[in-house]
Amino acid sequence: MSSDLDWIRARLRRYERIPGHLPQFGDDIDNFDTELLGALTPAAVLVPVIARREPTLLFTKRNANMRRHAGQVAFPGGRLDPGEDAVRAALREAEEETALPPVHVEVVAPIDDYATGTGFRVTPVVGIIPPDLALMPHEAAVESLFEVPLDYVLDASKHERRTGEWKGRERTFYVIPWRDGDIWGATAGMVVNLARILTQ
């Protein structure tokens, strides 16, 4: 799959996002409880594409002492504050978690909302950032930041399906193996959605 940034811009801006649409793929791929959809909390994440010669995606690894999603690999993001839209929330959270100034983010487009098994309806916002920023993880929330080649994470052959038990039920979810920490669950599902959109 090509990771040319102009091609990505063109594909995403041409894509017709359906607000509130439950994506084809979720972190409970085959068994998401659709009865929960009305009670989901709005949230947003920034999907930061770093504009290197070979573009990369920026991920955070959450601190092990966090109350939610401890130690997991994630995009920077969180719930919407009152009066915020998804883009503003994604930029605010990215600045809080990684010291990324919003002025340096070229917002390309939001993609389909992503419903998580933990009760959130997440809007992923794809943005392009320059490669020379002095980013820094928020000490209380983020253990580290790392990059993964965009071509790698968009490669469907790296999108593994696994099963495991959660809250007494067997769940099916995506995993994208990586040396700095496996990308799995909701974050991997959002990457799979992005790959699907770019190849439609």
Q: Which residues are covered by each model-predicted region?
A:
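A mid-sequence, solvent-exposed acidic-amphipathic segment
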Residues: 153-161
